[in-house]
A protein has these predicted regions:
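Acidic, Ser/Thr- and proline-rich intrinsically disordered linker/docking segments
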Residues: 32-34, 45-161
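The phosphoinositide-binding surface of pleckstrin homology
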Residues: 2-31
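Broad, structure-driven detector of short, well-ordered beta-strand segments within folded domains
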Residues: 35-39
Length: 161
């Protein structure tokens, strides 16, 4: 039985090793986290979780410098629901609260920017990217990002809006 997502909800696309970056004042108090970005038929979900990927697997999700619309192998809706329950830093954004999905270039790097309204009807913005290098001490944080083409994800998100 699922607790966080509906029984008729299913994963449309998911990407591993994604870093989220919050904007505004909340971004000042929010450390970037690595996790899984999942799009279901009802929600956009980010779950902080470290996954180890081999280079062949990396090509499946980020080959040709494109964020591909695929599903994680061996990652089901039950796993997603369990990860949401385990990590309090997870967030769920209903697709009807999405305002915009766009690609933003900052310092020669393309980020996926999601704008949505939270429960208090305030606009929130998050950027998503994958990293080239990460510093692990004192806390795991990204240093440099890959510049990806997010067109497929943007089109998919806009089709769900």
């Amino acid at each position: 039985m699922r607790i966080n997502i509906d029984d008729d909800e299913y994963i449309t696309a998911s990407l591993p090793k994604i870093w989220d970056i919050a904007h505004g004042l909340s971004g000042f108090f929010h450390k970037s986290k690595e996790g899984v970005l999942a799009l279901t038929n009802k929600n956009l979900i980010f779950v902080p979780r470290f996954l180890q990927l081999m280079s062949k697997e990396r090509e499946k999700y980020f080959g040709d410098d494109k964020a591909k619309v695929t599903k994680l192998a061996h990652y089901s809706e039950a796993d997603l629901d369990e990860d949401i329950s385990k990590n309090s830093k997870s967030w769920i954004c209903p697709l009807n609260s999405l305002v915009d999905a766009e690609s933003v270039t900052i310092r020669k790097v393309n980020f996926l920017r999601i704008t949505f309204k939270d429960k208090k009807n305030q606009l929130k913005k998050y950027d998503f990217a994958i990293t080239r290098s990460v510093i692990s001490y004192p806390q795991r944080q990204p240093l440099m990002y890959y510049s990806l083409d997010w067109t497929d994800w943007i089109n998919l998100l806009k089709s769900h809006m």
